[in-house]
Regions:
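Ser/Thr- (and often Asn-) enriched beta-sheet segments in non-cytosolic proteins
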Residues: 3-5, 140, 156
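Intrinsically disordered, low-complexity segments enriched in small/polar residues
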Residues: 6-8, 41, 83, 90, ...
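Intrinsically disordered, low-complexity boundary segments flanking structured domains
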Residues: 66-76, 109, 130-131, 156
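Conserved SAM-binding loop
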Residues: 167-171
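Catalytic core of non-heme Fe(II) oxygenases with the double-stranded beta-helix
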Residues: 79-151
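Ligand-binding loop in jelly-roll beta-barrel domains
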Residues: 149-166
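Non-heme Fe(II)/2-oxoglutarate
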Residues: 1-78
């Protein structure tokens, strides 16, 4: 498992990691990817946009997320959260740089990746991106803060190969 404490506040403690990994591994497949609603958005890139202007990924089904919720609650007993992102990326899928500035909070991204994929971020458009690779065939946790005004956490995702489950939790510590 890989952890990235981007905001410096610590990454929420994960309990039952093996159980969560097992469940996300079942989702990170070609068969699941092809069964979900695939979406693509395209337009003129805008780094300051709250949501990615250009995106390609699949939305994980509501039934799967409802069934996954009790496990997420068991895995993260020290936080209260709401799920704000539930996507499966396939080979070549990505979302471009955006801020999520319309929903400021602390955010935990949980990923399970079967291939080469990454999350990149920066705090200023003048800075280079800091790329954080996903742990292959395992879990990656990233904790960071979203703000409604600068400095933003500009971020994007690339899935070069394999499949990448991404679950976003807006959270507060208990």
């Amino acid at each position: 498992m890989q952890k990235y404490d981007i905001h410096g506040k610590g990454v929420p403690e994960l309990h039952h990691a093996e159980e969560l990994e097992e469940q996300l591994k079942k989702i990170a497949t070609k068969e699941m990817y092809e069964s979900f609603h695939w979406r693509t958005r395209s337009g003129t890139p805008n780094s300051d946009a709250p949501h990615a202007v250009n995106a390609s990924n699949a939305k994980i089904s509501k039934d799967i997320m409802i069934n996954l919720l009790p496990l997420l609650e068991k895995c993260f007993p020290s936080i209260v959260f709401r799920i704000t992102g539930d996507y499966l990326y396939g080979p070549g899928d990505a979302i471009d740089e955006h801020t999520n500035s319309n929903d400021p909070s602390d955010l935990l991204y949980i990923t399970y990746a079967t291939g080469e994929s990454s999350f990149s971020y920066r705090f200023s458009l003048d800075d280079d991106f800091i790329e954080t690779p996903d742990y292959k065939n395992g879990l990656t946790l990233r904790a960071f803060t979203l703000t409604s005004s600068p400095p933003f956490t500009y971020h994007k995702v690339d899935c070069k190969s394999g499949y990448r489950v991404s679950i976003g939790l807006r959270y507060a510590q208990l």
